[in-house]
Amino acid sequence: MPLAVDLLHPEPQREIRCHKLKRLVQHPNSYFMDVKCSGCFKISTVFSHATTVVVCVGCNTVLCQPTRGKAKLTEGCSFRKKQ
């Protein structure tokens, strides 16, 4: 009796929605990112699930606010994931 789903080659969308420990290859949902300030254009490294308010080193503007999950970036700030 064949399975309805291929367990060795899961669909990417299904793999993303799956719990981090039940994936084929386990990996966390969190990451570090470079955030560029919209005022002084300095780059700061921020954790994606930061639990404190992160301010810019150069101009003391707020870069991100903590939520119960991922940190919410301030409008105008751009970011990229670190590898």
Curated annotation (Swiss-Prot):
Q: Name one GO biological process term.
A: ribosomal small subunit assembly
Required co-factor(s) are: Zn(2+)
Cofactor binding: number and manner = Binds 1 zinc ion per subunit.
| Keyword terms | Metal-binding, Ribonucleoprotein, Ribosomal protein, Zinc, Zinc-finger
Q: Which GO terms describe its cellular component?
A: cytosolic small ribosomal subunit
Q: Which chain segments does UniProt annotate as zinc-finger regions (C4-type)?
A: 37-59
Q: One Pfam family, please name it.
A: Ribosomal_S27e
Q: Cite a single GO MF annotation.
A: zinc ion binding
Record carries keyword Lyase:
no
Taxonomically, which superkingdom?
Eukaryota
Q: Which InterPro entries match?
A: Ribosomal_eS27, Ribosomal_eS27_Zn-bd_dom_sf, Ribosomal_zn-bd
Q: Does Oxidoreductase show up as a keyword for this record?
A: no
Gene3D superfamilies in UniProt: Zn-binding ribosomal proteins
Task: Give the similarity note.
Answer: Belongs to the eukaryotic ribosomal protein eS27 family.
Q: What is this protein called?
A: Small ribosomal subunit protein eS27
Query: Could you tell me which species this protein originates from?
Result: Caenorhabditis elegans
